[in-house]
């Protein structure tokens, strides 16, 4: 059920999606190497900087090791769903007349946020440029003039592929509600999610959409979504958002998508156990995914970032679950549990999730060791970015308390 009410506030400050260009790929710097020599014809796709919004790409810049190459390079855009890559569009082949090439993509290429840019070497002349070492950047390389392929560790290259494209943005994921539910829990619990959206008084009506990322299923264009519109100065409330979206039965997370340049509304959520005689639960706020800083204190973990999450002080009275929500570049990380005295418990559990994937499981499954009194877990991200959350639940009342982890250290 959705309700609407007018609220009165003395002052409200809302965020705004900054008016910047749609971008994808690595900006140019002086390359010191080339891509791998997999074959005369090969395709490279940059993984770490997916399209930052939905829109159209009209210009691409890339480095080529030799000039004077005829019909040697194609610019390609791929869409990744899970570990499957499918060609969206390609332009070229382009004649190479300089090492640093800027080409017009005509007609412009429509892209979705998260799409990836790549280059195909289609003539035996010159090579795409790269920077070694790649630090936090990497790309995949496959043989041939590819139109589809599957991710595997064997195709990953550790260097920074030098290709970049720009264009016009139309909409963007403004933020993520980390965990939502409308499903049966343990011990007779039934968890639902109340979501509220407040539009600033000074703004025009705010319209957008919710996109549901279901547990264990890599996100993609076919994910369930629902539009919303909130008049200036009012609140719209959905007492069971996933039921309103027709997606009950599985937990997950929610993307809040807005038109490019729109003011970001205030978004709050409450995940609650609907017991029929009152509720228990926890509040969540929208975690912004635009204009955020890769820095200590953020809720978004990035390559080189570390942080910690508490388990319960009493492992008999409470249970603990750990949730991970990867963003557009996916994530590779290690969760390592520690005893209360600071000594390591086990060797750590490695995890890898493709883009826009939400998963939650028990402490034991996620860390590889049993839950115990006073335990805590260290998060270390090696590639990509993600949001991490721990849920501590009372075994008698099923009352959950969730905390979103923050970055406490980083190696950049």
Question: What is the role of each PLM region?
Answer:
Residues 1-21:
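Sec-dependent, cleavable N-terminal signal peptides
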Residues 2, 74-76, 91, 209, ...:
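Context-gated lysine
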Residues 5-6, 21, 43, 80-81, ...:
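Positively charged, low-complexity intrinsically disordered regions
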Residues 7-10, 47, 84-85, 165, ...:
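Intrinsically disordered, low-complexity segments enriched in polar/charged small residues
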Residues 19-96, 100, 104-116, 120-184, ...:
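Beta-sheet-rich sandwich/jelly-roll-like modules and their strand-loop junctions
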Residues 168-412:
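Gly/Pro-rich, tryptophan- and cysteine-flecked surface segments typical
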